[in-house]
Amino acid sequence: MADQLRTLPKNAKVIYEHCLKQIPNSLSQQDLVEAIGASISVNDLSSALNILLSRRLLDPLRQGNVLVYRAVRLDEAKTVSTMEGDEQIVYSFIKNSGNEGIWRKTLTLRTNLHVSVVDRCLKSLESKNLVKSIKSVKNPTRKIYMLYDLVPSTELTGGPWFTDQELDVEFIENLKKVIYRYVHSKSFPPKKAAMGPDLVWGPEYNGYPTALQIHNWLRSTNITKVDLSLANVISLVDVLIYDGKVEKRSDGASYRAIRVNNENIDAFTESPCGNCPVSDICDANSRVNPITCEYLDKWLN
């Protein structure tokens, strides 16, 4: 394949080398004119592009209504050159789907090939470790195809919260507990028996953690082997906020834990009846009774 590069006309070689540097980005003909300059005429540029396309060193793509070109590495071009025509078509559509992949049914519709031909091509490409099939957490019955060496998008895998296409509730709950304990440790002074458990920091305290600090702390402790992104950590803190365990401070960046009351609450004392001064004469057959009690009615509603 290196011989093919050496035998390229000068203009085609210049264009190809420039496109290689832009991978994974694509370039329009106008982009090439602006990058290479006036050294190549429009006619020579078109001829060079046709040569590169014929040797499968460029992939033609569309971005809206604009035709663009993306370089194909030499080793991949060599692999593609050994494929049959139908295989090349199927491979091209799978490649262009990126890490979002493409559903087998969609692939059949877009290639306009018979389903048996598509299946044969897929089987061949999988046997060569050029493409792979994965399952989507949103549509577990669908087979999604993408290039073999690509990492599926979180839209397909569900990100770190899913294991084998199942929501890992235990993993999420354990991480929430760990993060809450960390935020709590930064939100209140150490307990001192003589001063009681409800100590708080003064207004000058600036040790409340940000999402980035929580993220860095998680990574430094190796609590989990799963590589969590900053966005993942923020989503967990948001859940803790909804749970009423953490609040975002007025600075908009740091977080403070909310003390959780773990004492057992007597449901009777929480109701109006537990504090009613005439509860001893309240009776279903009395003038003071639960049916006509406006306080109990409001509390129940």
Curated annotation (Swiss-Prot):
It is found in: Nucleus. Disulfide bonds: none annotated. One of its GO terms (molecular function) is DNA-directed RNA polymerase activity. GO terms for cellular component: cytosol; nucleus; RNA polymerase III complex. Transmembrane segments: none annotated. Keywords: DNA-directed RNA polymerase, Nucleus, Transcription. Belongs to the eukaryotic RPC34/RPC39 RNA polymerase subunit family. Component of the RNA polymerase III (Pol III) complex consisting of 17 subunits. Interacts with TFIIB. This is Probable DNA-directed RNA polymerase III subunit rpc6. It comes from Schizosaccharomyces pombe (strain 972 / ATCC 24843). The gene is rpc6.
